[in-house]
């Protein structure tokens, strides 16, 4: 009986606190948006973010803003990290991955091992907006892109080709895909990924990641 009484007493005490807890609601801070940011901003922040900021600051669409900012690096042939000009796989073929997420709908879309398309994040957005899929890969991703008007092109620039050839010439004699011991690992097997995040004036959040993955990866 004592244990039952103690249980009911404790239950009553807990119940009494419920209204107090429910009344302690976090008051939203005054919105400070819009905001747009990117990884490695110290290197290319102004160049990458300005197109997206121009859209957001004029009350344009959040997804348009982060996509156009991501496209800046994807379309830059001098940048070997992502998109056009990215370092290829071991066969000298550039394969790209990208993903996009949109806070208001909780939806996402992505592509992987996409060849011949300079702006994979734009294809990922179409996967999110025009299909019930989350992820499309390889030839299927390329076919999907072509069906939506994307042009298939050779993404291997002369600069990236020379870097790849230098890697091929210095492959391990054991054929084990590890870099030669005479050179630093990060100079041989670099990764290339960028991220762009945005918040609009309504505090909606969205983000894009675009990458060519590990340089000289096994396809």
Task: Give the location of each predicted region.
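Hydrophobic h-region of N-terminal signal peptides that target proteins for export
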Residues: 17-22
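Alpha/propeptide regions of enzymes that mature by internal proteolysis
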Residues: 2, 11-12, 16, 27-219
């Amino acid at each position: 009986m004592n244990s039952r009484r103690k249980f009911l007493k404790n239950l009553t005490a807990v119940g009494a606190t419920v209204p107090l807890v429910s009344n302690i609601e976090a008051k939203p801070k005054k919105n400070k948006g819009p905001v747009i940011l990117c990884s490695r901003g110290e290197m290319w922040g102004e160049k990458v973010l300005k197109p997206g900021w121009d859209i957001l600051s004029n009350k344009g669409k959040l997804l348009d803003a982060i996509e156009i900012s991501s496209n800046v690096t994807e379309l830059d042939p001098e940048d070997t990290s992502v998109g056009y000009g990215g370092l290829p796989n071991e066969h000298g073929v550039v394969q790209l991955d990208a993903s996009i997420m949109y806070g208001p709908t909780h939806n996402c879309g992505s592509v992987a091992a996409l060849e011949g398309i300079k702006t994979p994040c734009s294809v990922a957005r179409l996967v999110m907006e025009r299909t019930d899929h989350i992820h499309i890969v390889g030839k299927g991703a390329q076919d999907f892109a072509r069906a939506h008007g994307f042009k298939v092109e050779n993404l291997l620039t002369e600069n990236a080709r020379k870097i790849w050839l230098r890697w091929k010439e210095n492959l391990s004699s054991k054929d084990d895909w590890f870099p030669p011991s005479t050179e630093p690992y990060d100079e041989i097997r670099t990764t290339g990924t960028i991220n762009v995040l945005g918040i609009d004036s309504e505090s909606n959040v969205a983000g894009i990641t675009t990458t060519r993955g590990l340089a000289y990866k096994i396809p």
